[in-house]
Amino acid sequence: TAAAPASASSAGGGSVDERGIDQSVRANSPKADLERLFNSPAVHELKEQICDVGRRLWQRAYVDGNGGNLSIRLTEDVVLCTPTLVSKGFMKPEDLCLVDLDGNQLAGVKKRTSEILMHLSIMKAQPKARAVSHAHPPYATGFAVAGVQPPTCMIPEIEVFIGRVPIAPYETPGTPEMGLKVAELVDKHNTVLMENHGVVSWSNTIEDAYFKMEIVEAYCRTVLVTTQLGVQPKQFSPKHLKDLLDIKQKLGVPDPRIGLKECELCDNDEWRPGVTCAVPAKGGESTSATDPEAETVVKAVTDEILNRLKG
């Protein structure tokens, strides 16, 4: 089990963290204590944050229907999460749920999200994951459906705040297997594409987990636009990426690429833009490749049509 959120002793002798949450409450605490935690002012503030992020996900079309889910770890084994069958754009604080690390519901009138097991797997595998955001932003999800890992060394911001974005193999949503596939990647990555599914990001706050979702979606959108301009996308050099990694290291932001040789950075051998544009190259020359055999067939058909028209 992952470590509990950091806490400090209160004046009354209890254990309260910087969010004002009583860390002495556990999943096996008396129901009255769990209800008191669930309805406390500190947790209500976190409920409001989740509802706010849910609205932003919905407004940006990162979720549709009842899709997407959010969670915040409150204590060692108690987690606040979104309900199932509720639009993230219209959630209210009273809709949220309380669960333990096995997914058993502890409080809340609505049923917890079916995908909470993935959130809990992430929290167990990564002690720093105190908040998790899962959604289906269309551009990043497009990469996930295509099974294409977003290329690196194109825009500095994603390198600093996220880094390389891996793809977790597909598993049925809501199953323990899906959570385990994602959890295998969160020790080195804060944002993961889920094959044929969507995106999940984690951080110490739900706001920052959402920021990461925004960053990866904007990046994937930019990359897709770039591939349609009829030119080979430009990358900055491995040396420039190393400079960014040095900045991350000074800031204390982990990245598995820190310490690699320059020749091992910006490796996008698997990146193959799948869209070409019909914009002619400079000088009016066509960028399309031609098949001589196909051209011969086209010419023969054209000549035959012209001969018949003349006759």
List PLM regions with ranges.
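Glycine-rich flexible loops
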Residues: 1-311
